[in-house]
């Protein structure tokens, strides 16, 4: 690679009429020169993805997947910083060879606002316009943290939840959905009934996917699920807390079937929620397999 000396750069600037002469190069002049040269260079490079495709096959979704990006969230409990994985796609018409992949990342680099459902809608609309498409979809997945208070000692600690928000636009119509995975404790009613000394219990993952006519907060979904578990989980417990959660789970046994039915009943009662799926996976402590249940509504 040939490196230009300072005198060579000055000569180029003088030839292009950007800097008339002298030995010092002001930053503004150099920036102007580089911008002009960059545009000239781009005009000489073939734009292959904008060429015409002859196979007559549209692509439903094309874009980037698993872009890791720092974001801030606007939640009921304030602003929270986290790291998200994004999948950003648009519809590609049959006659167009390819989409402009760099524009997806460029769009994220321009946005510094805290993410909520309103911001997700704006971001999706901007993406569709920027890529000159009729439809597009953005999925944002991230760990969500909530400060929880231990039931006896009152000590506070963080617990993490997996959350995904999705915004989708097609021909001007927009819709969004949310998915939250909530870890809880479940205790087996049958084991309690037949055992003299206790009952087997385990950690369970309850996943709620929903669409709503009005915004439903992440914290609200978490509350719906934790209220129906044998017991909640906590990041940090002292011995009095451990005694409490053990006994609470024992007093509130739930089959995996009970878990999904009770959570579904709570969601149906919320008139903002239009449709949902509830799944529960119990990581059975006495088996090498999980118990699983699923309800879709309506």
From Swiss-Prot:
Pathway: Cofactor biosynthesis; 7,8-dihydroneopterin triphosphate biosynthesis; 7,8-dihydroneopterin triphosphate from GTP: step 1/1. Transmembrane segments: none annotated. GO terms for molecular function: GTP cyclohydrolase I activity. GO terms for biological process: tetrahydrofolate biosynthetic process. The keyword Hydrolase applies. The keyword Hydrolase applies. Pfam families: GCHY-1 (PF02649). InterPro entries: GTP_cyclohydrolase_FolE2, GTP_cyclohydrolase_FolE2/MptA. It is an enzyme of class 3 (hydrolase). It catalyses: GTP + H2O = 7,8-dihydroneopterin 3'-triphosphate + formate + H(+). The record marks 188 as: May be catalytically important. Keywords: Hydrolase. Its EC number is 3.5.4.16. Belongs to the GTP cyclohydrolase IV family. PANTHER family: GTP CYCLOHYDROLASE MPTA. Converts GTP to 7,8-dihydroneopterin triphosphate. NCBIfam families: PRK13674.1-1 (NF010200). This is GTP cyclohydrolase FolE2. It comes from Neisseria meningitidis serogroup A / serotype 4A (strain DSM 15465 / Z2491). The gene is folE2.
